[in-house]
């Protein structure tokens, strides 16, 4: 796993070690979750030729600054910011891996974040929505 930062976003990169990478899956987790809850899915995707690139959404996982910020995206325009975070990650990933197909897996709240991106006509190859 690589860990990069984009402003205050922690970007987790779980890269497949298979000889032929098939695409990239961006995981958008649910409320009160974090990317660590998806290790089983990340492992399965990596073993099947997919890179996984994700973040803990604002107020979740490693992005909790204090107990008061748990689950809080921002004091203003939080939803727009969390949607923009994911869009920025996907846009940057397209530049880094221009030939690979991009997919989003969104669970619960994460599925609504993914749908918000879909409304903006985000250029991705597919989307899986869970618990929507």
Give each language-model segment a name.
Residues 17-24, 50:
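Proline/glycine-enriched tight loop/beta-turn segments at coil->beta junctions
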Residues 128-132:
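Active-site nucleophile loop of the alpha/beta-hydrolase fold
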């Amino acid at each position: 796993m690589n860990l990069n930062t984009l402003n205050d976003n922690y970007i987790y990169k779980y890269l497949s070690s298979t000889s032929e990478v098939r695409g990239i899956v961006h995981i958008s987790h649910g409320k009160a979750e974090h990317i660590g809850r998806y290790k089983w899915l990340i492992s399965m995707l990596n073993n099947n030729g997919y890179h996984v690139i994700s973040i803990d959404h604002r107020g979740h996982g490693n992005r909790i600054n204090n107990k008061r910020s748990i689950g809080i995206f921002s004091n203003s325009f939080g939803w727009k910011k969390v949607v923009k975070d994911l869009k920025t990650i996907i846009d940057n990933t397209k530049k880094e891996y221009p030939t690979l197909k991009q997919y989003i897996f969104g669970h619960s709240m994460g599925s609504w974040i993914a749908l918000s991106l879909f409304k903006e006509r985000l250029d991705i190859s597919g989307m899986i929505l869970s618990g929507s």
